[in-house]
């Protein structure tokens, strides 16, 4: 059994994966410390792993959280941290979206930001890109203003390629303020809404981390293609890769002897 926790604002959205089925639980207030909540959840769970999605999952925040989990007595690897980009990929895999027919998009509207995540297939890889539209909607106050701003964002975000599936996630979508923009979204697309999306994606990834997922995936903090040199060797040009695709930029290193 795996438990996935997505922290958003003062709420923890939880999904439990057991024998291939993912169940959503009621959101709970986690108190002052997200990491302490994770530790308590892990210790209360008799077996399995914990998947965690932080809205601000920078390398330092994740490293500090991992060290705190180890100091509390949890085993290495018992808690797995995911970015929202990674969880977005998990959503697509869990829902079974067919990227060969079109892209999948997730509009994430929280108290602090408005971000669009696009998941698309590119040759043999799956690409996850994030675009921040917070500036375009943060000054909208009335329902009409937010609806108009969201409609403009939709036109910009979906201008490239074919998008067949859309998800709306976050507290910002509470209420019925987006009637005009929803009409534009639903033309030729499947549209779903829920607050447990990122938790369900992380639960799927955690459950299948050692499984059969074969599709290479890259997100916007990783390399999207091989990086290398073309060298002339024994009378012909050949490409020598230094860094493979899908590797974090900050951790990527490559060298060769000539």
Q: Which stretches of residues belong to each language-model region?
A:
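Glycine-rich phosphate-binding loops at beta-strand->alpha-helix junctions
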Residues: 52-61, 154-183, 190, 194-195
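N-terminal phosphate-binding loop and adjacent alpha-helix
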Residues: 22-42, 50, 136-150
């Amino acid at each position: 059994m795996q438990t996935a926790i997505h922290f958003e604002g003062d709420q923890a959205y939880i999904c439990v994966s057991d024998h291939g089925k993912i169940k959503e639980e009621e959101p709970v207030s986690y108190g002052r410390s997200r990491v302490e909540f994770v530790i308590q959840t892990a210790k209360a769970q008799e077996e399995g792993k914990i998947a965690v999605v932080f809205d601000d999952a920078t390398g330092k925040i994740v490293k500090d959280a991992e060290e705190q989990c180890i100091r509390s007595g949890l085993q290495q690897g018992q808690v797995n941290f995911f970015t929202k980009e990674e969880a977005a990929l998990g959503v697509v895999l869990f829902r079974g979206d067919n990227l060969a027919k079109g892209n999948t998009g997730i509009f994430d509207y929280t108290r602090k930001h408005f971000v669009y995540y696009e998941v698309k297939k590119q040759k043999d890889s799956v690409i996850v890109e994030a675009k921040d539209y917070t500036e375009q909607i943060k000054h909208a106050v009335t329902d009409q203003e937010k609806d108009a701003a969201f409609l403009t964002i939709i036109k910009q975000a979906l201008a490239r390629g074919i998008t067949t599936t859309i998800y709306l996630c976050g507290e910002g979508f509470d209420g019925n303020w987006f009637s005009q923009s929803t009409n534009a979204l639903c033309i030729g697309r499947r549209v779903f809404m829920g607050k447990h999306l990122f938790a369900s994606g992380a639960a799927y990834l955690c459950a299948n981390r050692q499984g059969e997922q074969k599709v290479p995936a890259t997100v916007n903090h990783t390399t999207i293609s091989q990086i290398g040199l073309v060298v002339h060797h024994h009378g012909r040009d050949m490409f020598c890769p230094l860094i493979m695709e899908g590797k974090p930029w900050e951790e990527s290193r490559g060298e060769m002897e000539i």
